[in-house]
C-alpha cells in the first residue's frame, strides 16, 4: 500500500500532472496543481449536496432517517471513488481542515477548497429547490437543518455534531490519507460512516457533519436558526482529529512526536 497515492490527500510535490518541456526543463501544469482540484471540489460538493437535499425534501415520513442516510452515504462514497484522485475527494470544510493539519493538503489550498465547497453547496441546494415541488420544499425547510428548535437542545446537538464528525473525519484521514492504514475501500468506509452517523444522530442534531451541507440550504431556504452549530461542531471535530493523528495515532511520516528516531 505504500506505493499508492492517498486518495484524500494532495501532495503537490508528488502530483503526477501533465509535464510540458520548455527551455530544456519540465514543469508541472499549474492548472492541475491549483485550479483543477478546486473545480472538482465544487463539482463534487454540488452533486453530493444536491442528492442529499433532494433525499430530505422527497423523504417519506414512513421511512424515517433511512432514505436520507442511504442517499447521503452512498452518494458521498460514489463521488469520492469517482473524483477523489484529482482533489482528494473532501467535499467538506471539516475534512479539508483535518487533512491540512496532518499534512495531506497544502495550507495555501485550504481556503480555495473551502470556497469551492461552499459554492458547490449553494449550487446543489439551489438545484434541489428548482426540481422540487414547492410545497415539499418548504415542508422540509429546503433541507436546511431545522431540528434544533429550543435553546435547551443546543448542548446535545453540538456535542452530537462533534462526535459524529469525528467518526467521519477519522474514516477519511485514516482510510485515505494515513499511509499505514489507507486502503482501497476508503470510499466505502467513508460513505458507510455517513450512513451510520445519520441513523444514529439524525434525530438529535440532524447529523450534518459538513458546514457546506448546512450553508447551501440555509441560504436557499432562508433558514438560519442555530445555524452556527453546524459550523462550530464539524470544524472543532476536524481540528481535533487532525491533532490526534499528528500527535498520537498517525504513522511515522505523519506523527510529530514519539518517533522511533
Swiss-Prot record:
Modified residues (Cysteine sulfenic acid (-SOH)): 53
Biological process (GO), any one: cellular detoxification
Post-translational modification summary for this protein: Sulfenylation at Cys-53(C53-SOH) when hydrogen peroxide flows through the AQP8 channel, making it susceptible to hydrogen sulfide produced by CBS. Persulfidation at Cys-53 is required to gate AQP8 channel; under stress condition, hydrogen peroxide accumulates in the cell leading to CBS activation that produces hydrogen sulfide inducing persulfidation of oxidized Cys-53 (C53-SOH).
Transmembrane portions of the chain: 37-57, 85-105, 108-128, 157-177, 184-204, 229-249
Any one Gene Ontology cellular component term annotated for this protein: mitochondrial membrane
Membrane topology annotation: Multi-pass membrane protein
Motif NPA 2 per UniProt: ranges: 210-212
Catalysed reactions, as listed in the record: H2O(in) = H2O(out); H2O2(out) = H2O2(in); formamide(out) = formamide(in); methylamine(out) = methylamine(in)
Localisation per UniProt entry: Cell membrane; Mitochondrion inner membrane; Apical cell membrane; Basolateral cell membrane
Signal listed as a keyword: no
UniProt keyword Membrane present: yes
A GO MF label: water channel activity
Extracellular topological domain residue ranges: 58-84, 129-156, 205-228
Keywords, sorted A to Z: Cell membrane, Endoplasmic reticulum, Glycoprotein, Membrane, Mitochondrion, Mitochondrion inner membrane, Oxidation, Repeat, Transmembrane, Transmembrane helix, Transport
Topological region Cytoplasmic: 1-36, 106-107, 178-183, 250-261
Regulation of its activity: Reversibly gated by a two-step sulfenylation-persulfidation process in cells undergoing diverse stresses.
A Pfam entry, by short name: MIP
Database matches in SUPFAM superfamilies: Aquaporin-like
Glycosylated residue positions: 139
Sequence motif: NPA 1, positions: 92-94
Domain notes: Aquaporins contain two tandem repeats each containing three membrane-spanning domains and a pore-forming loop with the signature motif Asn-Pro-Ala (NPA).
Family: Belongs to the MIP/aquaporin (TC 1.A.8) family.
Biological role stated in the UniProt entry: Channel that allows the facilitated permeation of water and uncharged molecules, such as hydrogen peroxide and the neutral form of ammonia (NH3), through cellular membranes such as plasma membrane, inner mitochondrial membrane and endoplasmic reticulum membrane of several tissues. The transport of ammonia neutral form induces a parallel transport of proton, at alkaline pH when the concentration of ammonia is high. However, it is unclear whether the transport of proton takes place via the aquaporin or via an endogenous pathway.
The protein's name in its UniProt record: Aquaporin-8
Annotated organism of origin: Notomys alexis
Source species taxonomy: Eukaryota, Metazoa, Chordata, Craniata, Vertebrata
Name of encoding gene: AQP8
